[in-house]
Amino acid sequence: MEKKLSSEKNQLSSEHILGLLPHRYPFALVDKVIENIPGERAVAVKNVTLNEPQFQGHFPERPLMPGVLIVESMAQVGGIIVTQMPDLPKGLFVFAGINNVKFRKPVVPGDQLIISCELLSIKRQRFGKVKGEAYVDGNLVCAGELMFSLVD
């Protein structure tokens, strides 16, 4: 029973996420955080639904989640990690780059993305690097390194 209570404390609701990230509809791509170690790692959920605007044109006959939005969802989970670091200056951390991103399987409406990110480094209190992975049904669909920068 105690383990369950402690794990629930490490979860973040959509309302809490809205307090950490500046993203709003239609670009808020994290539904909830199911594991959170502030400043170290986070695991989040993104439920992919046919009602999302990108599926009107990507592709109407065979809807696929655009790879850039999978990467953006990983970046938002990385942003949750970075924004909870106590010693960093306050400000807007933005997505600054990607390395070695690979897409392995398509993501379609009805899928649930499980996004896992881990902080790799912080430099000069303004640049961060995160390792991100996205899974559907336990299968890796995307992985790579994401960089962040503090905007003055």
Swiss-Prot record:
CDD domains assigned to the protein according to its UniProt record, in alphabetical order: FabZ
SUPFAM superfamilies the record matches: Thioesterase/thiol ester dehydrase-isomerase
GO molecular function ontology, one term from the record: (3R)-hydroxyacyl-[acyl-carrier-protein] dehydratase activity
Catalysed reaction equations from the record: a (3R)-hydroxyacyl-[ACP] = a (2E)-enoyl-[ACP] + H2O
Pfam families hit by this protein: FabA
Catalytic site: 58
EC code: 4.2.1.59
GO CC field: cytoplasm; membrane
Subcellular location: Cytoplasm
Alphabetical GO biological process terms: fatty acid biosynthetic process; lipid A biosynthetic process
InterPro entries cross-referenced by the UniProt entry: FabA_FabZ, FabZ, HotDog_dom_sf
Alphabetically ordered keywords of this record: Cytoplasm, Lipid A biosynthesis, Lipid biosynthesis, Lipid metabolism, Lyase
UniProt similarity note: Belongs to the thioester dehydratase family. FabZ subfamily.
HAMAP family: FabZ
Function recorded in the entry: Involved in unsaturated fatty acids biosynthesis. Catalyzes the dehydration of short chain beta-hydroxyacyl-ACPs and long chain saturated and unsaturated beta-hydroxyacyl-ACPs.
Record's protein name: 3-hydroxyacyl-[acyl-carrier-protein] dehydratase FabZ
